[in-house]
Amino acid sequence: MRTNFTNRIYYSPLGNGGSKVIPVLRIFDYSKAIEFYIDWLGFKVEWEHHFEENTPVYMEVTKGDISFHLSEHHGDGTPGTHVFIWCNGVEAYHTELINKKYKYNRPGIEETFYGALAFTVNDPFNNKISFNEKLPDKKEGS
């Protein structure tokens, strides 16, 4: 365990359930981000921050254990980022999204060469998010 003596925060070792990665994705338009992440993908806004009125937003959105930080700030994140997520329920989630008939995204779903069922969505800011679920191992001869 590592100790930060400046503020006495204790960190869990990597891989022992105390770690979480949260990608920072660059956005350029708050309304389009809400339409995509909240209205279509079904995430919820955990919090938003502005340094003052009429300044760029920095916010966290979540769906289950998945979190993204979305930032309008110049220099935060790089447009064109690709986030790869292992999760469960990919087929049902894909069906839910397709049934919403979002005009700007109709992702296909596929079995991948690495043994997953997967689909990828593209946000309005050129970021890609791939949702992947491990398929059961195929038995020899089946």
Regions found by a protein language model. Name each.
Residues 17-18, 24-67:
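Core segments of cupin and vicinal oxygen chelate
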Residues 1-34, 46, 81-83, 134-142:
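N-terminal beta-strand motif that seeds the catalytic metal site of vicinal oxygen chelate
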Residues 64-68, 75-77, 89-92:
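Short, charged/polar surface micro-motifs in flexible loops or helix N-caps
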Residues 44-47, 70, 105-108:
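A short linear hydrophobic-aromatic micro-motif
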Residues 3-6, 29-31, 83-128:
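Vicinal oxygen chelate
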Residues 52-57, 77-79, 112-117:
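Short acidic/glycine-enriched loop/turn segments that link adjacent beta-strands
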Residues 69-71, 120, 130:
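Conserved beta-strand in the GNAT
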